[in-house]
């Protein structure tokens, strides 16, 4: 690990050498928080070539996370000095955006795409970044007389409701709801035109300010103190009126630009300007209602429709809306889309189906990740020509199922599980956008009590509940473990030795070698020791 750290320090020394002066166009593109240009990325990646150099940085990121001071400097360089705290976009066709730059960096490492680039997003990312909508809304409410004061986002009661952590309200604009595949295009050019207007507006304001200062100085030299006081008072009033009239006549994007410029934290790609202040909605029901009104259907989406619904997609009140929803989850990674989150919320909370997902074919969709079961059902419904209906889960739904369509989707971030064999579960291939190898390594380094490790263990444990004793933990070697951490440590240890072992359902009619809590601790320690031995062997 010392080798990795020393290599990164040398890398930073090279990166931070004085550069040749930038042209005006390059200087404009190098706004803090913006991605590197193609030329800048060539220079950046040249220092991470051959791949062992990139792998070295990835090992450090895997063990220390994105907050490691050395990695923070590296990430700052890749973002012109400021790591964005919202959603970012990439040049990967199958993983076009990520919820954070850290997630993007970890994805590059875990999937060995070391030279993937961060790019400017082709459309506003307000729907991708959980906090952006609140910040833009609060910026629009700043009084005109306090334009230059830092913007403070206001916490509202809705921020603590069950719709967290994604935005509580969705834009009724269909393009906002979908991802980049539904973009109508042209917004990048519009953003460029707006940026030019904003720069011109700022220059005009600076020139006006200089002229006003020169006039004040001349008046102070020519007139007596009493007359100066009167003129300064009159001039102050006139300037105040002029500034108010200028603000009122300016377009909204200019006002937002000036407001955001006073707060450095807003210089991130996630603050892409929306064409106008969006009309927000409480949930996906409002989208359906809006679509009905546009078609002059005038029938309210009310309890009578809900009580008649059996979960069939064909019974949704608006066909075009249904097509939009299906297109969104099929063209993108379903488990990551805001569409799936809103749709799931509507069915679970409003229609009352609850968390479990079953259909009329007797299948119980496997919850390998928070939205996996729901997306498995919806992909089947959207793609299948047969009538697939959602039903309340009961004893008749005995067939564990996960749609092959879900497994086939490219999981850019989030969790991914193999289709489980009957009565067996190998574990999550991906969790939080990171591979199982990463989590095994972190388990060995940080232990079971680490918050991130604990969440991973909990997610895996809850992903497989089968057998006569679903809360017990048994493996395919007929060993029963006192806790999931000891089981996972043993699985990581065997996997490192190229041996396979899976979790298996615990049955009453089977005999198992039951480990005591003390033996379980020994298993955990054994994996930690083996990993540390391997690490010391690699890095000296």
UniProtKB/Swiss-Prot annotation:
Keywords: Cytoplasmic vesicle, Phosphoprotein, Signal. Residues 181-266 are annotated as: Disordered. Residues 256-266 have a biased composition (Polar residues). The keyword DNA damage does not apply. The N-terminus is blocked. Phosphorylated on Tyr residues in capacitated sperm. Residues 1-24 form the signal peptide. One of its GO terms (cellular component) is acrosomal vesicle. Pfam families: PBP_sp32 (PF07222). Residues 195-213 have a biased composition (Basic and acidic residues). Residues 25-272 form a propeptide. It comes from the Eukaryota. Disulfide bonds: none annotated. Acrosomal protein that maintains proacrosin (pro-ACR) as an enzymatically inactive zymogen in the acrosome. Involved also in the acrosome formation. This is Acrosin-binding protein. It comes from Rattus norvegicus.
